[in-house]
């Protein structure tokens, strides 16, 4: 069982989308987070993992879509996203690591 005291258990993955790339230029980063985590836990986790200062955290719950399968209807899991805005003067986060070469 994972522990919410470990910051890497709260932040699951960065969101890779056109909108999230546009927000990165403004200092706002989007992450998939655990559904039972709150804004304070997300803020502490981002500050510990990336070594930055967070000014605000906005969260949104996305309901899973209902999809047709050959056996009837199925459902994708619901997710929670966190949009984290860094404080002014904070270094940008290198989410995707260094160069591939």
From Swiss-Prot:
GO terms under cellular component: ribonucleoprotein complex; ribosome
The protein, known as: Large ribosomal subunit protein uL23
Pfam families with a match to the protein in the record: Ribosomal_L23 (PF00276)
GO molecular function: rRNA binding; structural constituent of ribosome
GO-annotated biological processes: translation
Subunit structure, as described in the record: Part of the 50S ribosomal subunit. Contacts protein L29, and trigger factor when it is bound to the ribosome.
Keywords from the named record: Ribonucleoprotein, Ribosomal protein, RNA-binding, rRNA-binding
Source organism: Corynebacterium kroppenstedtii (strain DSM 44385 / JCM 11950 / CIP 105744 / CCUG 35717)
Disulfide bonds: none
Function: One of the early assembly proteins it binds 23S rRNA. One of the proteins that surrounds the polypeptide exit tunnel on the outside of the ribosome. Forms the main docking site for trigger factor binding to the ribosome.
PANTHER family hit by this protein: 60S RIBOSOMAL PROTEIN L23A
Family of this protein: Belongs to the universal ribosomal protein uL23 family.
Gene encoding the protein: rplW
């Amino acid at each position: 069982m994972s522990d919410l005291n470990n910051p890497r258990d709260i932040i699951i993955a960065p969101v890779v989308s056109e909108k999230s790339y546009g927000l990165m230029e403004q200092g706002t980063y989007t992450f998939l987070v655990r559904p039972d985590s709150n804004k304070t836990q997300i803020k502490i986790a981002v500050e510990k993992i990336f070594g930055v200062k967070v000014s605000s955290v906005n969260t949104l719950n996305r309901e899973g879509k209902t999809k047709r399968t050959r056996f009837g209807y199925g459902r994708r899991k619901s997710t929670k996203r966190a949009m984290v805005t860094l404080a002014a003067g904070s270094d940008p986060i290198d989410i995707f690591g260094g160069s591939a070469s």
